[in-house]
Amino acid sequence: MEPPLPVGAQPLATVEGMEMKGPLREPCALTLAQRNGQYELIIQLHEKEQHVQDIIPINSHFRCVQEAEETLLIDIASNSGCKIRVQGDWIRERRFEIPDEEHCLKFLSAVLAAQKAQSQLLVPEQKDSSSWYQKLDTKDKPSVFSGLLGFEDNFSSMNLDKKINSQNQPTGIHREPPPPPFSVNKMLPREKEASNKEQPKVTNTMRKLFVPNTQSGQREGLIKHILAKREKEYVNIQTFRFFVGTWNVNGQSPDSGLEPWLNCDPNPPDIYCIGFQELDLSTEAFFYFESVKEQEWSMAVERGLHSKAKYKKVQLVRLVGMMLLIFARKDQCRYIRDIATETVGTGIMGKMGNKGGVAVRFVFHNTTFCIVNSHLAAHVEDFERRNQDYKDICARMSFVVPNQTLPQLNIMKHEVVIWLGDLNYRLCMPDANEVKSLINKKDLQRLLKFDQLNIQRTQKKAFVDFNEGEIKFIPTYKYDSKTDRWDSSGKCRVPAWCDRILWRGTNVNQLNYRSHMELKTSDHKPVSALFHIGVKVVDERRYRKVFEDSVRIMDRMENDFLPSLELSRREFVFENVKFRQLQKEKFQISNNGQVPCHFSFIPKLNDSQYCKPWLRAEPFEGYLEPNETVDISLDVYVSKDSVTILNSGEDKIEDILVLHLDRGKDYFLTISGNYLPSCFGTSLEALCRMKRPIREVPVTKLIDLEEDSFLEKEKSLLQMVPLDEGASERPLQVPKEIWLLVDHLFKYACHQEDLFQTPGMQEELQQIIDCLDTSIPETIPGSNHSVAEALLIFLEALPEPVICYELYQRCLDSAYDPRICRQVISQLPRCHRNVFRYLMAFLRELLKFSEYNSVNANMIATLFTSLLLRPPPNLMARQTPSDRQRAIQFLLGFLLGSEED
């Protein structure tokens, strides 16, 4: 029973969910209420059998936004619901998961309406000549609430009563999608509590200059833009020492002090950037937030820092086995601001975080830094996959700057980028003995000519524009653990410089680049580099002068001129759009007026996003000075989140974008095109009734087919209506697409090493999708790894999982009773039941060859549970580790049990 609301509080809307506190989840209820004319958000928590209420007033400082799709840690057994962030006056940001997406959106709409209503009630305070602060009428601000909801799907344009793509929750990560469109007002990006209090000091007089303009947010942004252009007038370059280290620890715990690595220079560094790979190799590390190894290595690092200075941890970010720590001298911490972290998994389906990258970006004084720690694909022959991993990390990793209304920043939009990690590039020399002989002769330069990273950089296929210091140390991989002996196992790995540190940017001078042979914990040796980096330090006196001058110039221009834009084109056609295939169209906008201007794409009336979920503009907002031009890219990418409604005809490649010019007019851009339907994202019922490839089926029949299939699934009918009018043959037992993929893997991949653990190649995945959409091939193109990933993508994109949502809880309840488990499966609709049994038979067959393919029952059960047995939307946020374990156990019963009759 929920505790009563405060006296006089009138509830307007309520949602239930979980508050996220690091790895913990606590049940809670969020209630929008009105009391004494004031709107409030009431948070009710259940802590240790006690009820706790927090009340946050809804005023001009209140923020409530929904997150777009993110990857904190890869948890493929979980299917998180909507995530929202709440922040108010003097209150830290709080994060919540709401399981019911539809209710969440309605609740956020109610909060938005309350914010607007409350803003109209605000009465400006009596102005005081001694005070610079003046309350602003919120309604005069430039679309403060437009695009407030930062989610990917534009649900306001959908009929929620229809069968929609209910599986489209942020668990699956496509490898190369454009990021979702973020609202201008999106707040902090994941668990960061960065303070901006150490920015260049702004006096009350300077603040006062901002206020007279009614659109103060726009004005402040324009002045910041002008200040950035005149930066050289008020900054000095000051040199700081950066220590950068990387170590693949092979899942080991620290067994000795790290001083030989971290405290090897006479003078202490100002900043430490320390990256680990393979921190935790346990299966649990892939699916849970907690890791004992994280604590062990973090403490070991803190103990090993330079003894001549005191340090404070600035940030830690971890994705499974990759961890990055940033430490700064305590006297420098106050100059670090705008901290953000991001993670990208490039493992199978872009989910498994065994490979990928983690990064921290920050501003140190007035210079922007991005530190990336990555672990790229293994195996000598897979250098192209490593190149792809690098490109994927660059394409998918973007940061939302805390407390800043700025577009997302990618890695390359920073002034200094340091990239470290186990990049896994090997030597193109198959003879290990020859390599060891050259090492003994200290002929490293000859060996480096065969280094794959050097070759790929020369060919401009990876790490273009990055620099690397001269390598004078012997290869850091592979050794027998606890020794300095080269690998003596049966595989006898060829030594290689897998562990590297590269950088890009100006005023960067590398002093040392070395390995540390003293540490023998792992089969890799740690590597470090010491840098002198020139950092822009603000001279506050000169800054104030430039600031005030910029404001005066702005005042004169605003009084005399209005902004104006010129667009190179306004109509865009995207032809033959396909699932997971990115298309781009570019155009230019030019400031042909006399004053700096701010542009942004804004939502249309009654919309929460400026575009549909398959479209985005990059950049979606920015500043232009007179005669300045910027290129805008319009990107169309159909992911699992939008494929079903496009397949069914509920949506089309049609949209209108509104390009808004502050203090100016709006410009309208027309988007049109055609979409080619895909079997990916089509229901199992519909596919079982298609005897031909989906591209050969008329669109009108596809729509009818999906509608009929939905009704049939709801009624659990055993007999299916045939596709062709007048046809009498029964539907297929399983969709031909699943049969083709599974049959290929059964014939050719049972002995494939690391099956379902190594990602496919992007080009091959697209070939497989096209092949299944357009034909019934005798053989599937691409490698076994690509075919395996295609099968997983297919299962993930299903509108309804193989085990239907309504049977999810029964599956958990019967997880440890094989007899009841089989009874539950027997209640599935016919095609779902057939697909489940077919997949289980195939996976049992794979397990017979585990000696060759490195597949084990726990790994397979964990991976496929997230695809076959997904929790329904109303249970997503409530899913506990126990629920996940029961779901895995349910599948294990079929994988390890005897074959069904």
Curated annotation (Swiss-Prot):
Rho-GAP domain location: 721-901
Motif (Clathrin box 2): 702-706
Species this chain originates from: Homo sapiens
Disease tied to this entry: Lowe oculocerebrorenal syndrome: X-linked multisystem disorder affecting eyes, nervous system, and kidney. It is characterized by hydrophthalmia, cataract, intellectual disability, vitamin D-resistant rickets, aminoaciduria, and reduced ammonia production by the kidney. Ocular abnormalities include cataract, glaucoma, microphthalmos, and decreased visual acuity. Developmental delay, hypotonia, behavior abnormalities, and areflexia are also present. Renal tubular involvement is characterized by impaired reabsorption of bicarbonate, amino acids, and phosphate.
Gene3D superfamilies named among the record's database cross-references: 2.30.29.110, Endonuclease/exonuclease/phosphatase (3.60.10.10), Immunoglobulins (2.60.40.10), Rho GTPase activation protein (1.10.555.10)
Location of the region described as 5-phosphatase in the Swiss-Prot/TrEMBL record: 237-563
Site feature (Arginine finger) residues: 757
Keywords in alphabetical order: Cataract, Cell projection, Ciliopathy, Cilium, Cilium biogenesis/degradation, Coated pit, Cytoplasmic vesicle, Disease variant, Endosome, Golgi apparatus, Hydrolase, Lipid metabolism, Lysosome, Membrane
Reactions it catalyzes: a 1,2-diacyl-sn-glycero-3-phospho-(1D-myo-inositol-4,5-bisphosphate) + H2O = a 1,2-diacyl-sn-glycero-3-phospho-(1D-myo-inositol 4-phosphate) + phosphate; a 1,2-diacyl-sn-glycero-3-phospho-(1D-myo-inositol-3,4,5-trisphosphate) + H2O = a 1,2-diacyl-sn-glycero-3-phospho-(1D-myo-inositol-3,4-bisphosphate) + phosphate; 1D-myo-inositol 1,3,4,5-tetrakisphosphate + H2O = 1D-myo-inositol 1,3,4-trisphosphate + phosphate; 1D-myo-inositol 1,4,5-trisphosphate + H2O = 1D-myo-inositol 1,4-bisphosphate + phosphate
Limits of the PH domain: 1-119
Record-level GO BP terms: cilium assembly; in utero embryonic development; inositol phosphate metabolic process; lipid metabolic process; membrane organization; phosphatidylinositol biosynthetic process; phosphatidylinositol dephosphorylation; signal transduction
Protein name (Swiss-Prot/TrEMBL): Inositol polyphosphate 5-phosphatase OCRL
Job description of the protein: Catalyzes the hydrolysis of the 5-position phosphate of phosphatidylinositol 4,5-bisphosphate (PtdIns(4,5)P2) and phosphatidylinositol-3,4,5-bisphosphate (PtdIns(3,4,5)P3), with the greatest catalytic activity towards PtdIns(4,5)P2. Able also to hydrolyze the 5-phosphate of inositol 1,4,5-trisphosphate and of inositol 1,3,4,5-tetrakisphosphate. Regulates traffic in the endosomal pathway by regulating the specific pool of phosphatidylinositol 4,5-bisphosphate that is associated with endosomes. Involved in primary cilia assembly.
Domain notes: The ASH (ASPM-SPD2-Hydin) and RhoGAP (Rho GTPase activating) domains form a single folding module. The ASH domain has an immunoglobulin-like fold, the Rho-GAP domain lacks the catalytic arginine and is catalytically inactive. The ASH-RhoGAP module regulates the majority of the protein-protein interactions currently described. The ASH domain mediates association with membrane-targeting Rab GTPases. The Rho-GAP domain interacts with the endocytic adapter APPL1, which is then displaced by PHETA1 and PHETA2 as endosomes mature.
Superkingdom to which the source organism belongs: Eukaryota
Keyword Mitochondrion: no
